[in-house]
Each structure stands twice: as structure tokens, then as C-alpha cells.
Curated annotation (Swiss-Prot):
HAMAP family named among the record's database cross-references: DapB (MF_00102)
Pathway note: Amino-acid biosynthesis; L-lysine biosynthesis via DAP pathway; (S)-tetrahydrodipicolinate from L-aspartate: step 4/4
Summary of the function given for this chain in its UniProt record: Catalyzes the conversion of 4-hydroxy-tetrahydrodipicolinate (HTPA) to tetrahydrodipicolinate.
Record family assignment: Belongs to the DapB family.
Protein name: 4-hydroxy-tetrahydrodipicolinate reductase
Amino acid sequence: MTAPIPVVVAGALGRMGAEVIKAVVGAEDCSLVGAIDNTPGKEGADVGLELGLGELEVAVTADFEGCLCAVSQSVRDSGSGAVLVDFTHPSVVYEHTRAAIAYGVHPVIGTTGLSPEQLNDLTEFSAKASVGGAVIPNFSVGMVLLQQAAAAAARFYDHAELTELHHNRKADAPSGTCIKTAELMEELGKSFNPEEVDEHESLAGCRGGQRDSGLRLHSVRLPGLVAHQEVMFGAPGETYTLRHDTIDRSAYMPGVLLTVRKVGNLGSLVYGLERLI
């Protein structure tokens, strides 16, 4: 019988981290071996008790590198490869990903905010270290289908705008998912939204951010939202709208577990769930 995949979760007490831990604990082929979180007063607490899952005998720690070092040594002795699932903050995600690779732990990064330059650097670093990893802007299979549909529709429409809507505690804008959708639409190499009038904004930024391709991206942040995205295409006499709504974070868990199971077979860092399905 194959040994379960050792999994460390960073951001363990956050909303996404908690969902990941529930999914990992419920998966027969995975084993929770680390829980990293810097919430004050939680150091040393049993993460299972904190999340209402019962005792899991995995203590919460704020020592990111210390945890990775210990797990790396443990799996090296056992011959299996560990995985880090990171849902933390854009300000630390680059350092977290690089540290995981350095310790030989496969990073599965759900935290958005990495720049193209940082992604390139991490991809090169992971390839040199022969440590597979994945940066996934959105773990929803439904969102991958929307992105593929948007890329196909972009062949036929010259006018398009993207709107992403998230809860008001999301730090980065636009979302990594929205940027990824735009990038897929731009692979055709065409320009969008040719100017037909001399526009003037009476309120700066009200028309959204515009990429070099001409695509416009809009961000909405409100309490009550989870994660939502709309791509609207326009042509004379018609509009075509694609929309995906995440109602509950449990929707991401099949994609998270899929990535955890596949990342150990990769030779370097990949970007996007579509690379794995």
C-alpha cells in the first residue's frame, strides 16, 4: 500500500486553510503533518481542536521554516515527498514558495499576488532543484471551464471586459484568477476594445484597469461575497456573458486534492489548474 502524502498547510486557521485541513484529514491518501499560522495566542494549540475536528496531534506553529525543515527531514528519512499548501498573504507568498522548494517540499500555492518576474524566478529555481510545484490562481474546475470558454470566445469578439468580485478581506486586486483569464484570452495576440470615442473619466479609475491588449479589468470588494467572475463580450446587436460563482469554499477542495496528488510527479513549477487536468 502506498504511503499517504505528507501535507503541511500554511494559513491553517484561515478560512481556506481550515477547508484544506478538513479535506486533507478526510482523504485516505493524505496525512496532515504540519499546520502553520501566526494567529496570536495559538502557538502550540492542536489544530484539530481549534477547527472543531477533534484532536489531530498536529500543533499550530508560527515558525514557517522550522516546520518545513522538520518535515523535510522526516520525509527524507521515509523516502516520501511532502507537499506545502499555502493560503497566506501576497506579502509572504514568494518567500514561502522559494523556501519550500529549497527544503525539497512541493509547493501548492493558492495565495495570489506573485508578479510575472517572481513566477519566472520560482519556475527556474524549481527546475534547477527538480522540485515540482504548482501556483493555482483558482482551484475551481468550473472556473477553468469558464477560462477555456473565454479564450475560445475571444477569437470572435473584439470587445470584452472582465469583472471579478470578492469578499472585502481580499488583499490584492485584480484577482490572480482574473489576470489568468485575461492572459488566456490574450494568447491570440489580438488587441481588444478599439477606441471609438474620446473617453473622459470624471472619476479616475471608473473604467477599470486596462491591459496592454486593451482588455479592461474591474474589481469589486464587498462583505457577503466569496469569489465570482464575469467576462462580458460585446458586438453589434448582441452581448455574450460568461459567469462563475463560488458559493462555498468547499468547491475548491477537489482541485486542491488533485493538485496535491499530482505535484510530486512534476519536474518544476506549473501555473494554472488547467495544466493538471
